[in-house]
Amino acid sequence: KLSGAAATLVANGDVEAALGVDMNGATRRTAALAGVDFLKPTYGTVSRYGVISCAASGEQVGVYAKDAEKVAEIMGVIAGHDDKDGTSLKDEAYDYAITDVKGKKVAINKYLLDKADDATKAKVLAFADSLRANGVEVVEVSCDMAEIANTAWQILMCAETCNNISRYDGVKFGHRAKEYKNIDELYVNTRTEGFNFLTKAVILYGSDVLSKTRYKDCFDKSLRVRRVVAEGLQKAFENFDAILTPACSKSEYEAYDIKDAFGKVFEESVFTAVPNLIGIPALVTNGVQLMGNHFSEATLLSLANSVEKEGK
């Protein structure tokens, strides 16, 4: 069954909070399955210094906790400018204060809702009902932009990861193969031993989309899709304070062979790719996901808190 160590530790009460790097939504999926909160903040608000970089243009350090109040508390400590991180925004601090949500407007993405199983749909609809009870206007919309966003992000993520982890060659740092006869064998044996099947698949696909024959049709086009998606979401956030979606398609997953992982991850990432692609914040709470405009973390946390208070 799919689980995450950090999410499990928080769920079990072993720690009050934990940090995780959200690159492709895995942190949000494991939080949803474990029943804890996870906030992927606006890109550049939390330092990535010290993180092993894979997909640098979309990965972001976020916070696991049992409730929105604790997430807000931790974010108030870790967010802010860091000279050691070239992607860090210049703001020294951000506002994560939880406020009243009466009058806020939230959209449910019915397109993504229909892709989830019945148990997950029930969680989303129950969350929406709780928001309405707290004075939030909730309406249904249908938008398939998540599909092209997912495809674009998988291309960009694989390309960036391929480039970034090329440094792991057994020479300067990381794993080093013990048996080799020349430098080429050192590279091959080190990477064969050190990378699992999924990582190797990402490297191969990333290398392909960066090739001379595929760069323009794949990588370059994905960058253009990123801009189109960003513009489309900006228009949506002119009318809504947040978008409510499932965080994943199921409430529980059975184990599957690692060789099927690449396809499985692609299928699930349709729910989580948009925030990574365009850098907006996303909060998983009560097994559902809230997405907001850049720097709208306080709104997302407030919406989550209004529902969480009912369950206490």
Where are these regions (language model features)?
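Short glycine/serine-rich loop segments
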Residues: 1-78, 278-286
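Short connector loops at secondary-structure junctions
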Residues: 133-153, 286
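Flexible, glycine/charged-enriched surface loops at secondary-structure junctions
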Residues: 84-89, 135-144, 234
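Glycine-rich, small-residue loops and helix-cap segments
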Residues: 16, 78, 125, 130, ...
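Short acidic, glycine/serine/threonine-rich loops at helix termini
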Residues: 28-33, 50-51, 119-121, 150-153, ...
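Acidic, glycine-rich active-site loops and adjacent beta-strand->loop/helix elements
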Residues: 23-27, 33, 112, 144, ...
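A short helix-breaking turn/cap at a secondary-structure junction
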Residues: 40-122, 127, 185, 189, ...
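Flexible loop/turn segments at secondary-structure boundaries
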Residues: 25-28, 115-117, 148-149, 211-212, ...
